[in-house]
Amino acid sequence: MADDFRPHLLITEDDVEAIENKKQARSKDLGLDRMKHGTKLSTGLQEIVSAYTRVQGTDSLRDEDIRLFEVVLQEGEKFSNKTLREFLEQEGMTLAKVKDSRHAIVSSSKSKFDSLQQRVGAYRDNKRSNKKFQYIDDFQFPDGMGKQAPSIKELLEREATFPLDVEIMEQLLPKGTDPQVQARAEERLIALIEQNQGKIQAKPYKLSDGTPIVRAEIPLGKLEEISGDTIVSHVAPTGFYATSPMYTVQAGTPMTLNPNVSIDELPIVAVLDTGVDFPLELEPLVVEHWVPTGATPGDKKHGTNVASKVAFENLGEQLASGILTPRARIIDCNIRGLDPDSNKPDRPDLICNSTMIARIKEAVLRYKDITKIFNFSSSEETPIQGDEISILGYELDVLAIQYGVKFTISAGNHYLYRSQDTLEDILKDDDNRIAAPADSMLNIAVGAIVGAEHKEGLSRQYDVAPYSRIGPGFRGFRKPDIVSLAGTMTKAGVVPPDEYAMMIASGGQWAFQAGTSFTAPIVAGDLAEISQ
C-alpha cells in the first residue's frame, strides 16, 4: 500500500482552510433598545396568534394543544450554542427543526405560548425578565411560500395550473409529543389535500428518524393553501431515480481470477443496484444475491457494470490481460426492480422515493454487521433544489448516523454536452448542479474527471467529465466530495472506448460506458481497501 498512488484520494494543502476557534461570550449585552426590540418581538408573537386564528377552521393542528412557529436569531447567533438552546427550552420553546444557523421551527403548548407573550412583554417594559431575549431577532408564523421548493415557486410565478406530483414533508413533532397528535394531523392533511382536488399517489411513509411524508398529485393552484398548513414542513416535486444506459461488446479474452488472491480475506461492499451477473469464473466474489421483500429483481445490466468497478482496480488494464486481481467482494443488493408505486408507465426504469428508501433501509438492516460500505449509483435526472436537502439525501444521512454505514453516491449525469459547444459553457450552466441524493452531507458524493483525452470529446485529460454534475450542494455545501477517473462522452453521445470506460457487462461481455455511476464504485472499492 505504501507505493499505491491514488490521486483522486489526495487532499492538497490548497484545499485545507484553517479556521480560528472563536469562543463566544453569552453574557455580552448587545446594547439594543429594549422598548424597540421588545415591541418587535411582541408584535411577532401577536401576528402568530392572528395567523392561527385565520387558519383555525382548516389547519391540521387546529384541535391540538400545540403552536408551531419560527424563531429567528440575531446576526452572529447560532442554534448550535447550548446555552441559547437551554434558554429557549426554559421559555417553553422546544426545537422541532433547525433550518439553518439562525432560523428554526419551535413548538410550544398554548399555555406556554401565552406565558411567553407575557415574559416578552416584561422584557419590553424593562421589568425583571431574561436578558437572553436580546439574542432573538424575531418570532414569525411559518410562511407557506417559504416551504415550497424553488421549482414549484417558478411554476406558480408562471401561473401554471396543471397537477404536479409532489412529496409533502410533515413537521416531525418534538419527542414527548403524543404520537396520536402527529397521526391526527396527517389524517387532516390528507383530507385537506383531497378537498383541494389532490390525489394521494402512494401510502404515506416515514423516514428513519420518523419524519412523515405524504405523496400526492395536486393542482398547482391549490398548493398555496396546502403549503400554508402548519404541519407542512416542505413541499417538493417527487423524486425519481434512474441509471445510465450502456452498450456492450463481446469479451476479447476469457476472464480468470488471480489464483494467488485469498478471496475470503477480501473486504466487502454492498452494491445497491439492478443486480449482478458476473461470469461463472468471477461468481466466487459475490457473497450473496439478495432481492428486497416483495420486489421484482432488476435486469442485472447496470449493476454488473457497477460491481465490476468495485471489485477490480484499474479494470480496463486487467480486462486486457484476462487475469483479474480482485480487491473486494460484493453483496448483490438487487433493489432496482420495477416500482409499482412510481406511476410512470412510460418510464419503467424510474423508482420513487418511498420505494427506494424502503429497499435501501432493508438492505442496510440486513447487511450492516457484514459491511459498512454501500454503493448507490442512481440519481435524479434533474439538479437539486438546494433550499432543502433532498428527501433521499436526508434519509442516507440518518442511516449513516444510526448504523455507522457509509454510502458512496454518484454525483449524477446531465446531457448539456449535447447542446453546449465547450466545457466552459457546460460548467457555467445551472443545470449541471449535482442531483439527489448526492446532496447527502455525511456520505461521499463522487464526480468524474476524464482519464484519457479524445479529439471528439469536450474535456481534456483530467478535466471535469462533460457529463459529470458539479456543486455546490445543499445550501452551498461543497460537492462532490471526491472525483475519480472515468471515460468521456462525445457531443453525439458516444463513449470512445478506452481503459477508463471499460467494465464487465452481464452475460460475460465487456461494456464501454461513461458516467458518475461508474466512479462512485471505484471510490467504494478504494474505501474498502483502506478500511480493511
Residue ranges and their predicted role:
Residues 173-187, 300-388, 394:
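Subtilisin-like peptidase catalytic core
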Residues 267, 273-277, 281, 428-524:
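Extracellular S/T/G-rich loop segment that most often corresponds to the catalytic His/Ser-adjacent loop
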